[in-house]
């Protein structure tokens, strides 16, 4: 899963990607976070657009929070384990360490996640009016194989863009995610 500001950090076309979390995210992504045994959060500040969807006490019990800024660790959600460091370096070290262990079969969970994702895609009733998701789907079809950066202002179009365009590389979606500054895009 990803936050709005983290879209593209993990390819949206990857089968293991479930969606964007938070109030503007996909139901399936929020459910995956609620149901997970362990959440490794990398570089997120857990703003109110994210945390409003979760029981903070339950989330805190299964949270490993990685951030380069020590002040962000446990700032919003108490963290079971806090790791201060560069995300790439921490992930490389974590992967090296985890390779020494064997894990249970995750195919059941993976199938559940795929089912959640499929249920999230609701067929839309076709009308003579073109809806925002259809416009964004057409835009995505035109840009998906190109090196394109998308920038938005704040508002409903920002949410639609985050939900309906797929970002497969980092830094391809530029938007104001903090104070919601008008005139950003």
Please report, for each region that a protein language model flagged, where it lies by residue.
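Glycine-rich, acidic loop regions that bind phosphate or pyrophosphate groups
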Residues: 6-110
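Active-site diphosphate/adenylate-binding microenvironment
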Residues: 112-185
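Predominant activation on well-ordered alpha-helical scaffold segments within soluble catalytic domains
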Residues: 1-2, 30, 88-95, 133-140, ...
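Conserved catalytic cysteine-centered active-site region
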Residues: 1-14, 166, 184
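General beta-strand structural signal in soluble alpha/beta enzymes
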Residues: 1-3, 41-42, 85, 150-154, ...
């Amino acid at each position: 899963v990803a936050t709005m500001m983290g879209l593209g950090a993990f390819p949206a076309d990857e089968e293991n990607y479930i969606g964007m979390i938070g109030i503007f995210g996909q139901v399936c992504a929020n459910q995956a976070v609620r149901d997970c045994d362990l959440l490794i959060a990398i570089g997120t500040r857990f703003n109110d657009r994210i945390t409003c969807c979760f029981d903070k006490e339950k989330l805190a019990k299964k949270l490993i929070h990685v951030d380069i800024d020590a002040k962000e660790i446990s700032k919003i959600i108490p963290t079971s384990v806090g790791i201060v460091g560069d995300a790439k370096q921490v992930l490389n070290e974590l992967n090296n360490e985890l390779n020494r262990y064997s894990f249970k079969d995750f195919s059941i969970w993976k199938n559940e996640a795929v089912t959640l994702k499929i249920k999230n895609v609701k067929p839309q009733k076709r009308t003579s009016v073109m809806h925002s998701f259809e416009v964004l789907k057409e835009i995505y079809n035109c840009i998906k194989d190109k090196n394109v950066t998308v920038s938005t202002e704040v508002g409903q179009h920002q949410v639609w863009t985050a939900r309906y365009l797929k970002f497969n590389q980092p830094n391809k979606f530029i938007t104001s995610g903090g104070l919601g500054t008008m005139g950003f895009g």
